[in-house]
Amino acid sequence: MIPGEYVLGSTPVVINAGRDAIDVVVVNTGDRPVQVGSHYHFAEANAALAFDRAAAYGRRLDIPAGTAARFEPGDSKTVRLIELAGSREVYGLSNAVNGTLDAGNARQEAKTEAK
């Protein structure tokens, strides 16, 4: 094996199979490109991105880990979002949640408009 070499199996690997997914239209209303990483709580993404933040609550991009989606100024694109899994805890980012996504009235208390 060569360092960095990929050894792939013969069967396809489907990422995020069986996850509840939604499609959301996103428009970059800003004057600079915006990138959002694969595991970022999408509802807290850059304020220049216009989309349904309530629908995006508790979700992330349905893309391979370690990658990102890029939104150029003025661009409109549809992205697929899946639910965050695991403990469903979000800390930091734009400080809208800072805890468990599903706790009591966390959705109502979260500032779903990015700062």
From Swiss-Prot:
Keyword Hydrolase: yes
Associated pathway: Nitrogen metabolism; urea degradation; CO(2) and NH(3) from urea (urease route): step 1/1
GO molecular function: urease activity
Catalysed reaction equations from the record: urea + 2 H2O + H(+) = hydrogencarbonate + 2 NH4(+)
Keyword list, A-Z: Cytoplasm, Hydrolase
Pfam family name, one: Urease_beta
Subcellular location: Cytoplasm
InterPro entries: Urease_beta-like, Urease_betasu_sf, Urease_subunit
Family: Belongs to the urease beta subunit family.
Subunit structure: Heterotrimer of UreA (gamma), UreB (beta) and UreC (alpha) subunits. Three heterotrimers associate to form the active enzyme.
Protein name, entry field: Urease subunit beta
Organism name: Arthrobacter sp. (strain FB24)
